[in-house]
Amino acid sequence: MKKPFIGIVSKNIDYSCEADVYHWSFQRISDPLRHVIYDCGGIAIGIMPQTLRENFNKKDESESTLLTKQEQADLIECLKLCSGVILQGGIASHNYEEFVAKYCYENNIPLIGICAGYNNIIRGLGGKAELVSNPERHNREDVVYAHGCKVVDKDSLYYSIVREEDFEVNSLHTYIGTQIPSELSVVAVSDDDQTEVVEAKNKRFFLGIKYHPELLAKIDEKQKRIFERFVDECKK
């Protein structure tokens, strides 16, 4: 069977400093994410913003600069190359990511949004993601597993994949969904009742995951199964 193209939407990273006359910036793709896609039978390709902009939002909040009609059209042409799409995590979010989330929802394209990608799914569909009240508990780079995760909807795609009701996850974020759009169902929460996983039940595969399953895929089989099922759906 032909391998599906999985588009990973890039993140803008600005490495420039005052002494840098070139003001370099880059578009980043997470290695663990492209590795797990390849390992599960997909071909990972980068989806970059189609714009001449050099300055992007530096926070994980909605960006005021919107895409032009031409930039939207060009980005759609990139998305049409893909059988599925992933919105990455990161410390900043951009309007083009919200646009991708909405486009995938409206066109029933399989999508996973991870961490900031989860935020951009929520924002793209009209909801809100804001600073978490206890970042010291949820931004834990020092441990593999940071807190518990509990499935609250067993009639969900997510539960059919993980097949466990209570388990541990990592946590590397400072923003959380505070206003969930009606298009999404909350299917799992953290042990302090933060929304951990959302999904659109009327779509083929549309998941927003607050934690980072790609960082656990090598050691936690149920987390790898998320990507296996995703790639399988993208083959259809």
Walk through the language-model features, giving the residues of each.
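Catalytic core of the metallo-beta-lactamase
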Residues: 197-198, 205
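N-terminal beta1-alpha1 cap of cysteine-dependent amidohydrolase-like domains
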Residues: 1-116, 123-127, 136-161, 174, ...
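Acidic/charged, solvent-exposed loop-and-adjacent secondary-structure segments enriched in E/D, K/R, S/T
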Residues: 131
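Active-site-proximal beta-strand elements of phosphoester/diester hydrolases
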Residues: 207-211
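Short catalytic/ligand-gating loop segments at beta-alpha or beta-beta junctions
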Residues: 168-174
